[in-house]
Amino acid sequence: MEFMLDTLNLDEIKKWSEILPLAGVTSNPTIAKREGSINFFERIKDVRELIGSTPSIHVQVISQDFEGILKDAHKIRRQAGDDIFIKVPVTPAGLRAIKALKKEGYHITATAIYTVIQGLLAIEAGADYLAPYYNRMENLNIDSNSVIRQLALAIDRQNSPSKILAASFKNVAQVNNALAAGAHAVTAGADVFESAFAMPSIQKAVDDFSDDWFVIQNSRSI
């Protein structure tokens, strides 16, 4: 089970990399847009400095045609290093690019997955991660859990090294459901992780223990 942060905000990454068992940081053009006019590859280097050498970083191509996707991928790896994961949408051109890039030794995250067949094709093309869009599928009345379950079953049946990296979450319940359905990893915004600890009962339990200890020991520490 892997937990990744879906953000390029350095304050969020610094905070949550110290709290979470962080497996990686994911990004896309929409996430980059939230940060304003940044030097994108300098920001990726800053992220690497914050999270260390072990967690993965995932960067998305922009071009939509086969040759353009390859050029984007080559530039990303030149700028961000050989260990970067290239996010490629599973379109006809994207699937072709995934096959070509895997032959060149690239790490690939197949993204924009809404259907089982997209995921199955990405598995066969050699993608390291598959990123089904959980909330976006829900909004289209697609059974997100069923898609994840079928892809997880295919991975297990074929003993494939591909992993399901579920993305596009609006709440913790969706994250829980994705993992229960068979996702190997999830990526979510800092707000989703924040909400995981927002239940008042959690803090009340901690406060009660502290108060009870204070009654018998007159101290707020052991």
From Swiss-Prot:
Annotated gene: fsa
EC supergroup of this enzyme: lyase
Disulfide bonds: none
Main function: Catalyzes the reversible formation of fructose 6-phosphate from dihydroxyacetone and D-glyceraldehyde 3-phosphate via an aldolization reaction.
Localization annotation: Cytoplasm
Name of a matching Pfam family: TAL_FSA
Name of the protein this chain belongs to: Probable fructose-6-phosphate aldolase
Species, as recorded: Streptococcus pneumoniae serotype 4 (strain ATCC BAA-334 / TIGR4)
InterPro entries: Aldolase_TIM, F6P_aldolase, TAL/FSA, Transaldolase_AS, TSA/FSA_arc/bac
Any one of the GO CC terms: cytoplasm
Enzyme active site: 87 (schiff-base intermediate with substrate)
Source species taxonomy: Bacteria, Bacillati, Bacillota, Bacilli, Lactobacillales
Domain of life: Bacteria
Family under the similarity heading: Belongs to the transaldolase family. Type 3A subfamily.
EC number of this enzyme: 4.1.2.-
GO terms, molecular function: fructose 6-phosphate aldolase activity
Reaction(s) the record says it catalyses: beta-D-fructose 6-phosphate = dihydroxyacetone + D-glyceraldehyde 3-phosphate
A Gene Ontology BP annotation from the UniProt entry: fructose metabolic process
Keywords linked to the UniProt accession: Carbohydrate metabolism, Cytoplasm, Lyase, Schiff base
PROSITE patterns: TRANSALDOLASE_2
